[in-house]
Amino acid sequence: GSTLYSTACVYGGPSNTLDDCGNGNSAMAGGAGTAAGASYAFDSGLTVAVGYTGAGSSTAGLMTKEGTDVFGGQLSYATDSYGASFTYANVEDYSDDDGRIFYALNGYWTPSETGAMPSISVGYEIGEADGLDDTYQWFVGAQWDEAGPGTFGVAVGTTGATTDVVNVNKGINDPELLMYEAFYSYAINDGMTITPLIYTKETVAGSEDLTGVMVKTSFSF
């Protein structure tokens, strides 16, 4: 599924929350076990992809009523300076045996010359299900590819799909929670890259927000 998708996003932050550029459910980023997919890229910059991921139950296999299956597809278009993509997924047993359909739009723009102007990536996803509140998530990221010897990026977005509904009487507590992050990636040598990141993640009312630092080290041979 998502490994063959070409989501229109040029933001390269290393966190596992905002790295999906706002389309984590529609792009099947989480996976469910077994996966399959196919994609085809046209010379015009258009790419078409389909994907499947699923997990059987203890008594039944894939693509059965007892299992969990996700079917989806993506249409994307990319050029050197801009791109857009539409992603769709039908998720069975998304929450408490309720299925949900997700749609996402993503886009990016990159300046003709690197410098003071960053590249911009955005994403917005909605989830629908009969008799349930719609969910949504969003993402905005900016990245400077030539910031001194490395790449600098900042982003903000929801921490996942949310209904933004809080109803104490019904026992619903699903507010919009945001995450903010900034990273700087630079090469130590030809085979090693260091990427420190600082982030703040909002939590539900009554809990302190989470702030942390992580460092990603990448090697190439």
Language model regions located:
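Surface-exposed coil loops of outer-membrane beta-barrel proteins
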Residues: 1-71, 164-166, 172
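Transmembrane beta-strands of outer-membrane beta-barrel proteins
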Residues: 1-2, 49-53, 85-89, 108, ...
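Short active-site-adjacent structural elements
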Residues: 7-9, 162-165, 192, 202-207
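Outer-membrane beta-barrel proteins
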Residues: 24-26, 63, 95, 130, ...
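Residue-level signature of outer-membrane beta-barrel architecture
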Residues: 40-42, 77-79, 109-111, 144-146, ...
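Detector for outer-membrane/organellar transmembrane beta-barrel domains
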Residues: 66-70, 75-179
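C-terminal closing repeat unit and adjoining cap/tail of repeat-based domains
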Residues: 180-198
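Outer-membrane beta-barrel "beta-signal"
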Residues: 186, 209-221
